[in-house]
Amino acid sequence: GDTLASNHVSSAAELSANVPNLQATSTLGENIPIFSLRGVSMSDFSVNQQSPVATYFDEVYKGSFPFIPIGLYDLERLEVLRGPQGTLYGKNTTGGAVNFISRLPQFENEGYLSLGYGNYNRMDANGALNVALGDTTAARLAFTFARRDGWFKNRVPGEPDLNQVRNYAIRGTIRTK
């Protein structure tokens, strides 16, 4: 998680440069990746197609592409398992599995905030607030925000520029002992 943050990896498609043998294409949007491991991928890109590289978020299977949108924020770690994983994860893992593990609430008060600004009026913010609610319960609220103007001018009146970014996500977690 910290390695991804220090390398400024903000979308699943950017993982290819940081994880050996993992390729990610984004034909359906920046945060809806199609993973390929060691050359095993899929050739049909219909929305109900199941990939041979399974995607999990906190060990919950994300099957069809519309249910995969993934924001890489406040992650504890990323697990990439190469090769068939049918014994561990079951179906749709002939090419491998990618498991995104988010940070769990800790039993102490802490938080962080990261802000950024870039070209094409890009603004980024992400952070988390962790609160201990007594000795046995803790809560964590994490968020991410990314906005960038498009760099292709759309000549259609009233329509936004092409390739703009508008990503917003929030995640709340409660943990008890």
Mark where each language-model region is.
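Short, polar/charged loop or turn motifs at beta-strand boundaries
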Residues: 1-9, 37-39, 57-58, 115-117, ...
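Transmembrane beta-barrel wall of Gram-negative outer-membrane proteins
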Residues: 110-112, 117-177
